[in-house]
Amino acid sequence: MDVVITALGPDNVGLADPIIHYVTGQGARIAEIQMYDHDEEQLFAMLCRIELDPSRLELTRKAMALVAEHTRLAIRVWSPDERAERPRLALCTTYLPQTSRTILQAIADGHLRADAAVMIGNRRKCEPLANEFGVPFEMIGDDEGTPDERAMVQLLDRYQIDYVVLARYMRVLPPSTCWQFAGGRIINLHHGLLPSFPGLRPYQDAFASRMLTYGATCHFIVPELDAGNQIINQQTYTVAPGTSLSAIIERGQNENEPACLLEGVRRVVDREVKLHFHRVVVT
C-alpha cells in the first residue's frame, strides 16, 4: 500500500535516520523522499512516501510514535488506501459559499465519492451552509479573521482528514501546516488561470489585460512557494467584448470556480492523479 510519512520539528542532527532505518527494515520500498532544513527557523521537515505491506501499517504508526517521542518531531503516517472508498474531506472557507456548496451537493447526490467530515472557517459566513448539509462547523479565526493555525492542525487530526480542500479559503497556509499534510493532501482553488494570473485579484488583472477568456485553477499546495504550479484541473469561459467586470466575476464565482474545484477534487479522490515530488502524475 501507498504510505506517506511526514515529520516536522526542531532541527537537529540525525533526525531522518530512525525513520528511514525503520521503514527499510520493514521491507518497504522508498518511492519518494524529501528533506529540508529551514535554517532561519531552525526547522526540520521531511516527507517519505513508501510502498508498505498493509499488515505492517499499524506497527509502523506505533514505531513512528516512539520516534516522535525521542526526537520531538510531529510525525504523521497516512495512507490514501485506508479509506480509498470514501476519503474524508475538510472544507476550509472564508466568505464565498459557492464552491463549498457544489462539493457538498455533489457528495449528497452521489457524484463525489467522499465524505465531508468538517467545515473549517476563519469567518462564520459559511456556517449556515455547513448546518444545511449537517456538516460540523469549526471556527478558527479571531475577530479579524486571523486563523489559529495550531487549532486547524488539531482539527484535521481529530476529524481524521484525508484531504484538505481550500474552497476559496482566503488565507495562506504556513509552511508548517503544508509540511504536516504534504504529499498531495491539500487541494486549493485559485480564482484565476495559473501561471498567468496569480495573486489576490486575478479577475481584475485579466480584465486590465483585456482578456476575453477567464478561468480558475485547482492545484495541490506544496510547502515551497517557488516549486511551480501543481495543477490538477483548469476550467475556462469566454466572454464577449465589452462584458463588464462585475458580470465576469459573477459568472466565475457562481459557475466556473465551483465546477473547476469539483472536477479537481474528483480526480484526486478517484485516484486518477497524485502528487509525486512536485509533479502531478496520472496513477
Question: PLM ranges: what are they?
Answer:
Residues P10, L89-Q98:
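Short, glycine-rich nucleotide/cofactor-binding loops
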Residues N131-Y159:
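Adenosine-nucleotide cofactor-binding segment
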Residues I30, I75, P136-E138, Y163, ...:
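Hydrophobic beta-strand scaffold residues
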